């Protein structure tokens, strides 16, 4: 396994303070946190434990204290609901015309769509049927469906909260849109968010994996992190694992790199579509290419909202569905997306579907409905992103800033620190490594602490090149910042101010690779991973869209691994953890307490 070249210092590289112990897979815990799910398990496990990455605290009813609920799905844009409906209908008609022009066989026959009005005629007459509990659930288990006396709820218990029950709890999802969910409301500070994560992970380790927290001092941890990361957050994760949870040692790995290990490939463009974000990165020899990384703010949850909007237009029989107020309904839409949606143009006409739902009184109901092009139009929003405007038009693309543009007051080898000390002591410039750091251009300081390591490309802000450039009174400083955004972080262009479609984002990411040979290799190995790539036909559709936009003769291959796509990164991290070459990546609890951030600079498997 190759790794990034760590930044050297005049004092040389750190030496491990302890003898490396033999690797023991049952003692290695692999953790892959996401916006909606947490995947955690031993490195020797066939599959990880997958649970909801959320926690619910029992409220103390006090005057003026209102319950706080993080939404499970992205919220609808409520600025102008009437205008939103009109615009959505316009885009639905455009997408419908695109589908009607699809050829479905060798005889050049076109698709035949079923109008929503015809489907609504059937669906409005559909009546829910009472059925016994599925899976022969016992009456005793039904009575224990929800433990209302528990002070803290996790996983399935949260998903069983009705709108009425949820009023007694504050519910937090500590990660949203791929990063820590830090906000200004109740329980939204950085330390509170880390406490939520500690609670969830402790529950998973103790209650589900049956590992006593006191025994973690004999266990190791591998944490899968995003390709586009905030260095301050990674530092907090290390402290959480080694000092608060008490693991003996740990190391971090980027999710796209872990995915290549899980898929068994040495290079490729990894497209990770999660519940609330889509990230793209080009991997070569185990290294994530800096300029190719991007995180887009849409995912499977946005597709759920599009699907619900489309189903309502054709008379969705479950009229009380409210994904914003009920986690039960939000989970239902997630299941309907997995069961109904596809990207197979040959499937057309009305299809009769059924789904089951448990009501608050314990009664199970079965709904029957007809679905037409709604099943293909919802995932088509990945490529016709105007449909995603219902969850907000103000979208941002995040790319990773180079190390010299990131600041950390606790890192004594930070580029900014070296500049400041170099001014006071000119003799330090004699060191060639320090001199190289001092010679790098200096960008403007960040606007906020939470986004200090992220370059934000916002299509709503006017800019000649698609990069949001902060207003400044100094033209030279503004030009320097623009230069950094253009050359180091990449520019993700948007058509008519619209969020970038999936195929265009992949083309842009691969286009930023250094050589034509690397680009050719990336086009030939596009790996789809993540919980939202299970839609049948998605890989073939993306491959067709990309093939039409590259030079003739370029081989394009989009594929998924023959396993649960959401587990590929976890499995890859488990494989990495037991490799002989990964021994030098481990950071022990003692070393972290003694050296801190310097260890990440020296040993992280990616450029710090």
Curated annotation (Swiss-Prot):
Gene Ontology CC annotation, any one: nucleus
GO biological process: chromatin remodeling; DNA recombination; DNA repair; regulation of DNA-templated transcription
Molecular functions (GO terms): ATP binding
UniProt main location, coarse: nucleus
Localization: Nucleus
Region entry Disordered, spans: 1-20
Keywords recorded for this protein, A-Z: ATP-binding, DNA damage, DNA recombination, DNA repair, Nucleotide-binding, Nucleus, Transcription, Transcription regulation
Family, as annotated: Belongs to the actin family. ARP8 subfamily.
Subunit (UniProt): Component of the chromatin remodeling Ino80 complex. Exists as monomers and dimers, but the dimer is most probably the biologically relevant form required for stable interactions with histones that exploits the twofold symmetry of the nucleosome core.
Protein name (database record): Actin-related protein 8
Source organism of this protein record: Drosophila pseudoobscura pseudoobscura
Annotated gene: Arp8
């Amino acid at each position: 396994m190759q790794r990034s070249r760590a930044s050297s210092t005049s004092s040389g590289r750190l030496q491990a303070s302890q003898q490396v112990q033999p690797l023991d897979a049952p003692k290695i815990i692999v953790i892959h946190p996401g916006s909606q799910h947490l995947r955690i398990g031993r490195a020797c496990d066939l599959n990880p434990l997958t649970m909801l990455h959320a926690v619910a605290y029992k409220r103390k009813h006090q005057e003026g204290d209102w319950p706080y609920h993080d939404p499970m799905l992205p919220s609808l844009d409520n600025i102008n609901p009437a205008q939103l409906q009109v615009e959505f209908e316009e885009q639905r008609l455009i997408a419908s015309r695109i589908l009607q022009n699809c050829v479905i066989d060798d005889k050049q026959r076109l698709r035949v769509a079923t109008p929503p009005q015809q489907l609504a005629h059937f669906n409005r007459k559909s009546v829910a049927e009472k059925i016994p509990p599925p899976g022969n659930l016992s009456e005793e288990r039904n009575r224990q469906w929800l433990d209302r006396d528990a002070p803290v709820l996790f996983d399935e218990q949260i998903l069983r909260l009705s709108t009425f029950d949820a009023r007694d709890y504050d519910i937090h999802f500590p990660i949203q849109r791929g990063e820590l969910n830090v906000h200004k409301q109740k329980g939204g500070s950085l330390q509170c968010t880390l406490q939520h994560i500690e609670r969830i992970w402790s529950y998973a380790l103790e209650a589900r994996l049956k590992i006593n927290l006191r025994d973690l001092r004999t266990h190791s941890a591998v944490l899968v992190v995003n390709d586009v990361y905030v260095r301050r957050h990674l530092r907090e994760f290390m402290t959480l694992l080694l000092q608060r949870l008490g693991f003996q040692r740990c190391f971090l790995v980027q999710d796209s790199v872990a995915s290549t290990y899980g898929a068994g490939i040495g290079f490729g463009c990894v497209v990770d579509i999660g519940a609330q974000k889509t990230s793209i990165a080009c991997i070569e020899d185990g290294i994530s290419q800096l300029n190719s990384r991007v995180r887009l703010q849409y995912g499977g949850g946005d597709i759920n909202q599009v699907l619900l909007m489309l189903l309502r237009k054709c008379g969705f029989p479950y009229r009380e569905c409210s994904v914003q107020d009920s986690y039960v309904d939000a989970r239902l839409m997630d299941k309907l997306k997995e069961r109904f949606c596809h990207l197979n143009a040959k499937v057309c006409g009305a299809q009769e579907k059924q789904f089951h739902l448990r009501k608050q009184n314990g009664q199970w109901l079965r709904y029957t409905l007809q679905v037409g092009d709604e099943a293909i139009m919802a995932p088509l929003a990945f490529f016709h992103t105007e449909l995603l405007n219902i969850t907000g038009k103000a979208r941002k693309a995040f790319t990773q800033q180079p190390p010299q543009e990131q600041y950390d007051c606790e890192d004594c080898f930070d580029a900014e620190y070296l500049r400041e000390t170099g001014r006071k002591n000119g003799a330090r410039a004699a060191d060639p490594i320090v001199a190289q750091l001092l010679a790098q251009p200096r960008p403007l300081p960040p606007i906020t602490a939470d986004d200090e390591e992220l370059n934000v490309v916002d299509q709503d802000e006017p800019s000649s090149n698609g990069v949001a450039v902060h207003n400044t009174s100094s033209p030279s400083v503004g030009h320097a910042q623009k230069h950094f955004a253009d050359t180091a972080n990449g520019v993700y262009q948007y058509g008519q101010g619209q969020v970038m479609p999936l195929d265009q984002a992949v083309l842009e990411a691969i286009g930023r690779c250094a050589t034509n040979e690397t680009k050719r290799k990336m086009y030939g190995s596009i790996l789809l991973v993540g919980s939202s790539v299970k839609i049948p036909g998605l890989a073939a559709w993306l491959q067709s869209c990309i093939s039409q936009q590259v030079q003739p003769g370029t081989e394009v291959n989009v594929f998924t691994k023959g396993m649960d796509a959401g587990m590929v990164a976890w499995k890859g991290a488990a494989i990495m953890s037991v490799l002989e070459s990964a021994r030098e990546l481990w950071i022990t609890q003692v070393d972290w307490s003694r050296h801190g951030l310097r260890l990440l600079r020296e040993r992280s498997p990616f450029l710090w």
